[in-house]
Design a protein with these regions (language model features):
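Glycine-rich phosphate/pyrophosphate-handling loop used in enzymes and phosphotransfer proteins
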Residues: 1-173
């Protein structure tokens, strides 16, 4: 009976990034050393979401990075939660290519906190669709999994209303 209870209510779990044993109270089920490596973005470019480094002598608020400054985009704003580094790469690649679909829940939790922090209001959640070929090969759409979890957490409707027509090359692997 104890083994059954340990399975349902485990005392310790593993870090979703490095598999190190942790307490289930750890933030996002990530160990302290991996969590320290996650660089949460405070000030980001309004267009690409990359961090903007502010200097103490700057008096005016900079909204765009040097790359995006004076470029036209087909959207108003982009927000990034965390810098892409070795630790966050393991989360993304684990979800996309190693069938670790449970990671979508943790990504959605991080996104929820950023949305609340930035006081962002919205009516619907959409996700970027995969081409049918890629969806058949992978078996799931990671963006849809994240969007589904985010929709549940923030109680905002998820819409599946756009489709991908063009097959594009993979960015990784």
């Amino acid at each position: 009976m104890n083994k059954c209870l340990d399975f349902i209510y485990p005392e310790n779990i593993s870090c979703i990034i490095c598999d190190k044993s942790i307490k289930k109270t750890n933030t996002y089920s990530i160990c302290k050393s991996c969590f320290k490596e996650m660089n949460f973005i405070q000030d980001g470019c309004m267009k690409c979401g990359k961090p903007i480094i502010r200097h103490s002598i700057e008096k005016e608020f900079i909204e765009e990075c040097s790359y995006c400054f004076n470029k036209d985009f087909y959207f108003d704003k982009s927000i990034s939660c965390i810098e892409y580094n070795d630790v966050t790469k393991k989360i993304v690649l684990g979800l996309k290519y190693n069938q670790k679909t449970f990671m979508a829940k943790y990504i959605a939790q991080i996104m929820k906190e950023k949305l609340y922090l930035e006081n962002i209001k919205f009516d619907y959640i959409l996700f970027v669709p995969l081409h049918k070929k890629r969806l058949n090969k992978r078996g799931f759409n990671q963006a849809q999994k994240i969007a589904f979890n985010l929709s549940k957490i923030v109680n905002i409707p998820l819409l599946d209303c756009i489709s991908r027509k063009k097959y594009t090359r993979m960015l990784y692997k």
